[in-house]
């Protein structure tokens, strides 16, 4: 996927929210929002796929530790439409990561037990309009 926005040296604590607002491209194949320590250590890889990597209208979540991907977790809900404007809110605690989008909340285990988010990256067919930390 094409590298997009990358933010480093963050200090997002448990219970705080990372909000990413933007627009899904009208011909989107997929995009991802990654949070964690750095590009090789991710608490969450959140990857809505319209039509890529053999998946159609599927949200794939995963973690990455020292450059090695964990087991993919495919979600049944797919609340995204090509061309839509969307706000994605990511929060976490010691046990899990929550991703809130309009109409759906996704949950994924905090497999690495990470205690803060230091890194955010948005890749693929998504145009970032705003980022907010709260």
UniProtKB/Swiss-Prot annotation:
Coiled coil: none annotated. GO terms for cellular component: extracellular space. Mainly in the liver (adult), mainly in the muscle (embryo). Homodimer. InterPro entries: ConA-like_dom_sf (IPR013320), Galectin-like (IPR044156), Galectin_CRD (IPR001079). GO terms for molecular function: lactose binding; laminin binding. Keywords: Acetylation, Lectin. SMART domains: Gal-bind_lectin, GLECT. PANTHER family: GALECTIN, GALECTIN-1. It comes from Gallus gallus. Residues 4-134 form the Galectin domain. This protein binds beta-galactoside. Its physiological function is not yet known. It may be involved in the regulation of differentiation. A beta-D-galactoside binds at residues 69-75. Pfam families: Gal-bind_lectin. The modification N-acetylmethionine is found at residue 1. This is 16 kDa beta-galactoside-binding lectin.
